[in-house]
Amino acid sequence: MSHIQIPPGLTELLQGYTVEVGQQPPDLVDFAVEYFTRLREARRQESDTFIVSPTTFHTQESSAVPVIEEDGESDSDSEDADLEVPVPSKFTRRVSVCAETFNPDEEEEDNDPRVVHPKTDEQRCRLQEACKDILLFKNLDQEQLSQVLDAMFEKIVKTDEHVIDQGDDGDNFYVIERGTYDILVTKDNQTRSVGQYDNRGSFGELALMYNTPRAATIIATSEGSLWGLDRVTFRRIIVKNNAKKRKMFESFIESVPLFKSLEMSERMKIVDVIGEKIYKDGERIIAQGEKADSFYIIESGEVSILIRSKTKSNKNGGNQEVEIAHCHKGQYFGELALVTNKPRAASAYGVGDVKCLVMDVQAFERLLGPCMDIMKRNISHYEEQLVKMFGSNLDLMDPGQ
């Protein structure tokens, strides 16, 4: 992609939006409007801060420093708090590792030494418990999550301690294990509380992606414990993983014949509502006769498609299931019932451990309109698929028989 002229700041802008979309908002258009509106307001306020009010902030490493010289990184500091989303800085800051441009698509090779902070078994258990509901960690595989946990360090805080200060450089992402914390924002020399954390949550993630100062101050209102993750590890694993996941999802969607008739913009919308699910060997993924509510693409592993025979019986006297197809990575299943608007015509079982990309039909219809309106563009393909997978004589009218 080196021959394509990418506007300065676009990569960081889209990285931030991509991470935020991981929250699975119900309406992507409304979410985008709200996100970029806050982004614009943050830029205006940042401009006011630098041009109108030459306030100074204190960092952990130095004495008072003029903001215009220390234009560093910003932070939304909360998934839930009502804070402005930061934007890439227009000013020049000192050269540091923290400010280096990060493009996850270009940095395929990673030779940096792994950061490891030794922990006792008890600390590891507490850390895992604190991180189990952190949205940013949801899409990490086991190896990546293990590297993140290895790199995190415990920080014990006291009452009234400033964890981060508005205007400071942002070097760490924090997960709350325990304690309460106030979120304070100063504007026009007026400081106000915009929210509070109560023994759960995380903050500081966007400061690791944008070149603007911290957007808020976080103060402990009780004794507590935090787990920190350094900027380099955060970007190397989490940001890069999100970018790779999205790229992989796009590749899968483009390879599915079912979506050949969709416009590029429509396929990109599909990527935004895809989730992942893992199934164990022999686990049933869909059941014949059940209502169809999801469509599946195999990310890794194999899936066996079976249908109940009308002529063969199992040992319990019921209709025996007979395999009619064996699906592998990149193949998909579960879409035919959505197209025909009928119950599942077959069952699907995992063969070994299986990871599937899952698309909810309601999300699909919300983004692209009723399924049939979209699918009619390529209806001949579905007829071919029906014959290929189930045979021309298969009765789909009553899959429960």
From Swiss-Prot:
The modification Phosphothreonine is found at T212. The modification Phosphoserine is found at S47, S74, S76, S96, S347, S392. Keywords: Acetylation, cAMP, cAMP-binding, Cell membrane, Cytoplasm, Membrane, Nucleotide-binding, Phosphoprotein, Repeat. One of its GO terms (cellular component) is glutamatergic synapse. One of its GO terms (biological process) is modulation of chemical synaptic transmission. Residues 61-83 are annotated as: Disordered. The modification N-acetylserine is found at S2. Residues 68-83 have a biased composition (Acidic residues). Four types of regulatory chains are found: I-alpha, I-beta, II-alpha, and II-beta. Their expression varies among tissues and is in some cases constitutive and in others inducible. 3',5'-cyclic AMP 2 binds at residues 258-401. InterPro entries: cAMP-dep_PK_reg_su-like, cAMP_dep_PK_reg_su, cAMP_dep_PK_reg_su_I/II_a/b, cNMP-bd_CS, cNMP-bd_dom, cNMP-bd_dom_sf, RmlC-like_jellyroll. Its main location: cytoplasm. Residues 2-135 are annotated as: Dimerization and phosphorylation. Regulatory subunit of the cAMP-dependent protein kinases involved in cAMP signaling in cells. Type II regulatory chains mediate membrane association by binding to anchoring proteins, including the MAP2 kinase. The inactive form of the enzyme is composed of two regulatory chains and two catalytic chains. Activation by cAMP produces two active catalytic monomers and a regulatory dimer that binds four cAMP molecules. Interacts with AKAP4. Interacts with CBFA2T3. Interacts with the phosphorylated form of PJA2. Interacts with MYRIP. This interaction may link PKA to components of the exocytosis machinery, thus facilitating exocytosis, including insulin release. This is cAMP-dependent protein kinase type II-alpha regulatory subunit. The gene is Prkar2a.
